[in-house]
Amino acid sequence: MKKDDYGIIGGSELLISYGRHTPWNNINILRSYEDAMSQTKTGNHWSSTENSSNNAWNVNFNSGNTNNNNKNNNNVVRPAVAHDSEWTALRETIQTAYIDCCKGKSSSRQCLDYIPHADEDLDVLTDELMNGTYTPDTSTCFLVKYPKLREVFAAAFRDRVIHHWIILRLEPLFEQICHKQGNVTHNCRKGFGTKTAVLSVQKGIKKVTNNYRCNATIFKGDLVGFFMSIPQRRMCDKLKEFINAQYHGDYKEMLLWLVEIVVMHRPEKNCMFNSNPEDWVGLQANKSLFRCEEGRGMPIGNLTTQQFANFYMAEFDGYVLQCLQAHKHQMRRQKKRFRWSYSRFVDDFIIVCNDKEFLMNLVNKCDEKLLEMGLSLHKHKRYIQPANHGVMFVGTYIHNGRNYLSNRTIGRFEERVHGFIKYLNEHEKEITITELEHIRDTINSYLGFCKGRQTYRFRKRIVGQFILQCQKYFFRSAHYNKIKLRRKFRPIFK
């Protein structure tokens, strides 16, 4: 089904978006009854001809009266379109993906802008999927400066719905891989995160060192420009091979087609900039899609990028685990005990074992495997030390059964708190409840990260400073774990 000369899918039988503006598709919007009449030869978009007494009714919602052929009424009733069961079933899955996409984003500007037109655009999106005409829309590119300079691409909201549609079908299969590998990866998974990653490394060190009584060696590796180095074609082929072998649900061909489109899409060739172009000067070449090698790179910011990258690294996880298990069996035949532990978070991974010579050889094998995958280890970010020296991982320094915040995290926390104090003092008469809630949520987020780490004295100092300066608005919990907004001030700011 193709668009006709007037931008209407399927010709005059389907009048889409009549009386509304839908900025997320390429349809030429018909803004009035007269426009609709002038752009067709028959003028028969309704149940009958224009002057027929059986014509479609326009409802005056202000008075409740119904006025036949009221051309000046803005509350236009769109004609109902009959769809087959296949279209309806697909539309329901798109609706499910849309609801999943809106979770946690209902207050964002993109979501609020999309909601009034969601039903119409999701209908159009369903048509595009049925007809095989879907293409990604324009993305928004911007730079995040905090905590470090990073390039981010925000996909159009309708494209995010497609991303969720894909992941809803593939995520359970990705989880099966993670479970089979022993849950060694902790990013982009429900129930996992930085906390479980730190606990995994801590338990691994404790196991390998026999409760800190034996010697062991730690290797920490980091990949160079991970997201911008991923070869698109290799990843796409791996995903399609995996789907063909493991996916047995509905819309398999459509899923394969969408994976090809999403993975091979180059958003930097069709994007809007929301940051000063001069800021890109300070961004490393291997951190930007605009300067990475052709056929490489995935946009940071998309749900599919995170999930697909995690799936891609599962191949590396499997290789490392296979090498460790093989050496364990070899040592067992020699009646020697070999202990090991492996954990990964995105592109950072840690291997702990009690055989230093084997670990050095394994690092070289990891280099070769990553080169085969189109990736590479960072030469200047290789950490090999005795386990009793501790290791820094995902913002936490893990040392002999204790966890400490990294200096960088402490510095960022102090910087934010002092910035909030200054802002509250300078805008005392202008501050709103929304801004106060944002300040509360940000500080509590940092305090939440402090849990499980030896941070009591630090929390007492930094929270004490904040409450001392801002006690008019906030108060703290007993153990400096949380700050709360004083309720008696809320009506004033509303």
Q: What spans do the regions from the language model cover?
A:
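Non-catalytic, polymerase-adjacent accessory regions of viral genome-replication enzymes
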Residues: 85-123, 486-494
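Short, conserved non-catalytic motifs in the polymerase core
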Residues: 104-108, 112, 137-161, 178-192, ...
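Active-site-proximal segment of RNA-dependent polymerases
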Residues: 171-231
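Conserved polymerase palm-domain catalytic core
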Residues: 210-346, 350-365
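C-terminal, surface-exposed recognition/capping segments
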Residues: 2-85
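Amphipathic alpha-helical blocks
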Residues: 114-138
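Right-hand nucleic-acid polymerase module
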Residues: 155-156, 164, 287-289, 293-294, ...
